[in-house]
Amino acid sequence: VQGHIGTMYDNGQKVTYNSQNIIDTVEPNNVKKVLVSSLSGLNALGQDTFCSETESAKEIIAMKGNDNVKLLPLLSCQPGIAQDTTVAEKLLDKNKFYGLKFHPSNTNKAIKDNFDIYSKYITLAEKKGLPCVFHSITDGKSDPVEIIKLAEQHPKHPIILYHIDLASQPEQMARTIDNISSSVKAGKSNLFIDISWLTNLWDNAEQNKNTIKQALKKLGADRILFGSDTPITEMGNRDNYGKFADFVEDTVKEFYTDKPKEGEKALNKIFYDNAEELFINKNWFNAKSQPSKSKALLIGVGVGIAAIVAIALKCLHGADKTVENSPSHVSKK
C-alpha cells in the first residue's frame, strides 16, 4: 500500500528517497501499483527538511512510475501547521490525488492538541471522496485512540491506521485492535489497518504473526491492507520486500489452514482488492454521490411521461463499471 519519496530524518540521519528507489524494490516482486506520499511534506516546521504542503505536492506530482509500476500520489497534509484547509483544497482541485496522508509524529502536531483542524481535513476528504491514512503509534502524537476518535466524528469515511500501533508491546497492540474492532462493529467508524512495521520485521516474527492473526480474527480480511513503507530502511531492499510479502502470505494461509479457499480470498483482499476498492474504484464514495432511483424519477415529474421513462431506463440499465486490473490471485515473485 504505502511508499515514500522525499527527505526526512531517520534516527538522526538525513535521508532522501526517489521514485526509482520504490520501483527497484517492488518491480521484481510483481507489484503493479504503489500509493506514495512525500516525506518532505511530513516534517516539523523549523526543520531544515521542512517543505510546505504546496511544495511537497509539487514533489509528489512530479514523480514518475514506469510501464510496469504505477505510482499513485497521496497528499501530505499538515494540520496544526496549517490552520485551515485552504491550501489543501486548492491542491486537490487542481491535481489528481488518491488520498490524504497524515503523520502527526513527524510534523510534531499531536492529534489531541489539534483535533479540530484534523477533523476539518477529514471533512475535506469526505467532500472529495479521498481516504485518509494516518501514521499510527502510541507516542502522544499519533495515538490510535485519537485516530479512532477522529474516525468516529466521520463514521462513514474510510480511515486507515498505518502500522496499527507501531512497535507497541503485544498487550498494547491487542488493545488497539480491540478498540478498532469495537468501533467498527458498533457502526461508529469505517476504520482499516495496514500491517507494515508492526515491530522489527525479523527479530519479532512470532509477535508480528500473532498480530496479523488477531487482526484477522477481530476485523476480518476486509479491513486489512498489506503495506511496506518502501523504500525506508529494510524495505528498500527487494529481497526483504519479497521476504515480508511471503511472511504475510504464509501467516494468512496458516490462519485459514482448514479453509484454504477462504484463505485465498483473504490474500486477494489484503494484497490487492481492499486497496483497489478504497483508493481507486471507490464504490464507497460513488454510491453516496449517485442519486437514488426514486430521486431520479422525482426530477422528471412535470416534464412528461417520455422523460420519466427515459430517466427510469437510465437508472435501471446503467452500464456497470469495469474493474481495471483486478487481480485474481496472489502473485509470487
Q: Can you annotate each of these PLM segments?
A:
Residues V1-K33, K218-L225, E234-I311:
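Mid-to-C-terminal alpha-helical segments outside catalytic/metal-binding sites
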Residues G318-K333:
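Non-Sec secretion/translocation targeting segments of pathogen effectors
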Residues K112-L225, E234:
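Catalytic pocket-lining loop regions of alpha/beta-barrel enzymes
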Residues V1, V36-S38, L74-S76, K101, ...:
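Active-site neighborhood of phospho(di)ester-bond hydrolases with catalytic His/Asp-centered motifs
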Residues G3-H4, G12-V15, Q20-G46, V69-Q78, ...:
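Divalent metal-dependent hydrolysis catalytic cores, especially in the metallo-beta-lactamase
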Residues T7-Y17, G41-S52, C77-T85, T107-N114, ...:
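Acidic-and-aromatic substrate-binding clefts and catalytic sites of carbohydrate-active enzymes
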Residues A125, I193, D229, L267, ...:
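Conserved, mostly hydrophobic/aromatic
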Residues Q47-G140, N190-F192, W197-N200:
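Active-site gating/metal-coordination segments in enzymes
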